[in-house]
């Protein structure tokens, strides 16, 4: 396809191996170092891109405190080959933070406010716990139930509303681990994982080029034996059907179509459309439905046009209703999360948006698809979606 000068193209994508937050490979690596390593390596393998041309580093991160505080985008950027004259900002849309980072860069390119951007995100949930420093306003309860801020309970609600059974959730969780393990064994993650040093379970320093979060030994019987994690009386959502708490970072090099043509770069894909949407916080996980419908309408497409979908697996009880109402549940094995998802790989909040987008592009490249959708729910009731076309 021919590019327009202000088209937004993805030049490359990379991510760290996903590490367990409790005693995992990244336990002695800071979030800024993880981010800087990733940015540096991605720029090294794209030597046609001059770091001096980077307009802005836009980095997603949710819990912006401790080592993730004080604008981690700038902290990480200063430790790379990107010069001090390039800017950097940290953004948060909770779970959708690094996809919002991509959207922010895309909007700048579309409006002529820069040509080259580095986007992505990080979350070290082992060093900065999910609730560290969080102090919700009690007055919020006048507008939204307190349970609406408890993501597991919103998944329980959504699953119950849509008649999702415990067995369906367990099957979905099993599928995630099986597909992620298959992708690992077949080398499907090779292009996206940028190796980095970490510590194994015995404390030895080694180079990791694989995700330590995947559990190939997972069985349906094992998942069925787990107790409900959020609603002990009558709940169906378990640790085995929820996204893992993990550490990781993801990164993309994004530029205008004109600059890519000038540099003789063959991009991976072009952004066709973007959208965000809000839903009732009580059904937080339903957000991808309206955001995807909106994005498809903006692109002049329908779901039938889409070859592959990456949906962040916050919870099986959340993902299944979304796929049902997007009319792709019966096509799941052909189109959706073909390399597994967050149940197997984990959901480091600030990292996940760029991670699922990049994984989608690799799935499209490996399977010959043309159009893809990356979408995710966002805590407190939002959805965010990007539609890509492979070049």
Swiss-Prot record:
Catalytic site residues?
95, 347, 377
Q: Which UniProt keywords apply?
A: Acyltransferase, Cytoplasm, Fatty acid metabolism, Lipid degradation, Lipid metabolism, Transferase
Designated name of the protein: 3-ketoacyl-CoA thiolase
Query: Where would one find the signal peptide in this protein?
Result: none
Q: Which reaction does it catalyse?
A: an acyl-CoA + acetyl-CoA = a 3-oxoacyl-CoA + CoA
Q: Subunit details for this protein?
A: Heterotetramer of two alpha chains (FadB) and two beta chains (FadA).
The organism encoding this protein is Ectopseudomonas oleovorans (Pseudomonas oleovorans)
Annotated PANTHER family: 3-KETOACYL-COA THIOLASE FADA, 3-KETOACYL-COA THIOLASE, PEROXISOMAL
Which taxonomic lineage is given here? Bacteria, Pseudomonadati, Pseudomonadota, Gammaproteobacteria, Pseudomonadales
């Amino acid at each position: 396809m021919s590019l327009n000068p202000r088209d937004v193209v993805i030049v490359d994508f990379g991510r760290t191996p996903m590490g367990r937050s409790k005693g995992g490979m990244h336990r002695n690596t800071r979030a800024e170092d993880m981010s800087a390593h990733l940015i540096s390596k991605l720029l090294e393998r794209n030597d046609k891109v001059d770091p001096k041309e980077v307009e802005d580093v836009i980095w997603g991160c949710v819990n912006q405190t401790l080592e993730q505080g004080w604008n981690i985008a700038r902290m990480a950027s200063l430790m790379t080959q990107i010069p001090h004259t390039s800017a950097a900002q940290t953004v948060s849309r909770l779970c959708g933070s690094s996809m919002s980072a991509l959207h922010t860069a895309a909007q700048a390119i579309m409006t002529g406010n820069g040509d080259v951007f580095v986007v992505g995100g990080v979350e070290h949930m082992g060093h900065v716990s999910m609730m560290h420093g969080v102090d919700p306003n009690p007055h919020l309860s006048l507008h939204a139930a307190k349970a609406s801020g408890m993501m597991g309970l919103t998944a329980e609600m959504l699953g119950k509303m849509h008649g999702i059974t415990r067995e369906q959730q367990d099957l979905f969780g099993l599928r995630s681990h099986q597909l992620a393990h298959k992708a690992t064994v077949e080398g499907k993650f090779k292009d996206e994982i940028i190796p980095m040093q970490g510590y194994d379970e015995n404390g030895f320093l080694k180079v990791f080029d694989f995700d330590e979060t995947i559990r190939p030994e997972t069985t349906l019987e094992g998942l069925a034996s787990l107790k409900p994690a959020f609603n002990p009386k009558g709940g169906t959502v378990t640790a085995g059907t929820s996204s893992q708490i993990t550490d990781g970072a993801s990164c993309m090099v994004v530029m205008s179509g004109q600059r890519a043509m000038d540099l003789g770069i063959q991009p991976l894909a072009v952004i066709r459309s973007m959208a965000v949407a809000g839903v009732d916080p009580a059904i937080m996980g339903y957000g991808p439905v309206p955001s995807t419908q909106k994005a498809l309408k903006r692109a002049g497409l329908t779901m039938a046009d889409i070859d592959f979908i990456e949906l962040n697996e916050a919870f099986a009880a959340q993902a299944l209703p979304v796929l049902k109402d997007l009319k792709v549940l019966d096509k799941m094995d052909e189109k959706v999360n073909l390399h597994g998802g967050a149940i197997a790989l984990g959901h480091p909040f600030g990292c996940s948006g760029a991670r699922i987008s990049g994984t989608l592009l690799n799935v499209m490249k490996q399977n010959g698809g043309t159009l893809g959708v990356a979408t995710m729910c966002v805590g407190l009731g939002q959805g965010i979606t990007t539609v890509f076309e492979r070049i």
